[in-house]
Amino acid sequence: MRLEVFCEDRLGLTRELLDLLVLRGIDLRGIEIDPIGRIYLNFAELEFESFSSLMAEIRRIAGVTDVRTVPWMPSEREHLALSALLEALPEPVLSVDMKSKVDMANPASCQLFGQKLDRLRNHTAAQLINGFNFLRWLESEPQDSHNEHVVINGQNFLMEITPVYLQDENDQHVLTGAVVMLRSTIRMGRQLQNVAAQDVSAFSQIVAVSPKMKHVVEQAQKLAMLSAPLLITGDTGTGKDLFAYACHQASPRAGKPYLALNCASIPEDAVESELFGHAPEGKKGFFEQANGGSVLLDEIGEMSPRMQAKLLRFLNDGTFRRVGEDHEVHVDVRVICATQKNLVELVQKGMFREDLYYRLNVLTLNLPPLRDCPQDIMPLTELFVARFADEQGVPRPKLAADLNTVLTRYAWPGNVRQLKNAIYRALTQLDGYELRPQDILLPDYDAATVAVGEDAMEGSLDEITSRFERSVLTQLYRNYPSTRKLAKRLGVSHTAIANKLREYGLSQKKNEE
């Protein structure tokens, strides 16, 4: 059990916390103190009544502002994140001490040298890599990285060795060792060829006019080129599957298969055979069918604990067993996961494996809700109108001048999917050649409630405040549909309201005066 105690910087507060644990006979496993006013405690599980009583007593300590449970200590979180990152790297990476002895290595290193981690730690870098004097380089106290061509097991590598400096108790930077990364020259050449040949139009179907969506697309284009697992998060209807496919198409795997599985729509007993195959029936699973390509696991938060364990094993070494068979199969597949759920929350509740979360959370893409991207609403509307009209072979209707105001005022709880369905539904029943606000039927939705949801608490104070401010303006603008009326209602100047509406994309195009 781990607690995060929010507190003031007061002399003796930590001692009072420890005395409280001693008084209750609680065995403390660890304590970590954060300089920004947080103390982390790690101790054995308690009965509910004892735990509730302890929480109440901690809150009564002078200087304590709050206390809550957390799934991990800061050092544990950093260790798990580092381990997941190292495991995801396709290049061999070694960490060596001042004697050039290996103290950490990732799976790619173990595979290259044909040694398990515990045996690699018995070697020095010089015993593993010929042609470079590691000790002499470390003794020279280098300040910059050094690149060197090396040959290992007949393979050519570009070795990059980077010095690691840490601060001592006197705030002096002391050299403690180095990190060695080995880049295969063959792999680097293939990557350059793939970059030149990648599908530059992969993201062309994604509308990105708003700054937030532009940033997400730029981030996705970079992540698409990597082979590590990708986790895409976002509310329902934000386009997670569209981004997953675009990442595949923009990657070196574009010419290989892309398969998608919704973990929430398939019974638990069928998921294993769908993913890994069924030997008695001679059926290949998704991973085997997509060898060399990508697999999207949608709604990963719905996966059962048993399948989570099997997925974790597959992510670690790329091997699996078909149902009803002992033979191991190895494939090269990039796994992309998508979810609208808060995986950290599921980890805290014991519904999602902590180690799997860290394995998936190496590369993440968070898609913003449509209400946070008002500049994208009309371009999306124009796209859906044109697409539907062309599919039906009918003339494209004109968009009414006041349509922008109505659509950008709405909060869109269903995001892009809801907008698309609303436009399609309106066009199927449209009389005439103009799409007007009254043609689009939208369920009542209180936009003001958006700002107090859990997702609205993410980001900086300015971002949270902006979301709340936009929600208030969106809600009130319905009942006070002019800048002067709205300004009077809120007790601010007409100019201030006009600027705010323009900032959030809520202003009408025609003159409101």
UniProtKB/Swiss-Prot annotation:
Any one Gene Ontology molecular-function term assigned to this protein's record: ATP binding
Compartmental location: Cytoplasm
Listed GO biological process terms: catabolic process; negative regulation of DNA-templated transcription; positive regulation of DNA-templated transcription; regulation of DNA-templated transcription
InterPro entries for the chain: AAA+_ATPase, ACT-like_dom_sf, ACT_dom, Homeodomain-like_sf, HTH_TyrR, P-loop_NTPase, PAS, PAS-like_dom_sf
SUPFAM superfamilies the UniProt entry points to: ACT-like (SSF55021), Homeodomain-like (SSF46689), P-loop containing nucleoside triphosphate hydrolases (SSF52540), PYP-like sensor domain (PAS domain) (SSF55785)
Effect annotated for changing S184 to V/L: Reduces the activation function to 45% of the wild-type value. Does not affect repression of aroF
The protein's assembly and partners: Homodimer. In presence of tyrosine (or high concentrations of phenylalanine or tryptophan) and ATP, it self-associates to form an hexamer. At low tyrosine concentrations, homodimers can bind to certain recognition sequences referred to as 'strong TyrR boxes'. Homohexamers are the active repressing species, interacting with two or three tyrR boxes in the targeted regulatory DNA, including 'strong TyrR boxes' and lower-affinity sites called 'weak TyrR boxes'.
Activity regulation (UniProt): Binding of ATP strongly enhances the affinity of TyrR for tyrosine.
Keywords: Activator, Aromatic hydrocarbons catabolism, ATP-binding, Cytoplasm, DNA-binding, Nucleotide-binding, Repressor, Transcription, Transcription regulation
Pfam families reported for this sequence: HTH_50, PAS_8, Sigma54_activat
Species annotation: Escherichia coli (strain K12)
Binding site for ATP: 234-241, 290-299
Note: Regulation of individual transcription units within the regulon reflects their physiological function and is determined by the position and nature of the recognition sites (TyrR boxes) associated with each of the promoters.
Entry protein name: HTH-type transcriptional regulatory protein TyrR
Outcome when changing R2 to A/S: Shows a decrease in activation of expression of either mtr or tyrP. Does not affect repression of aroF
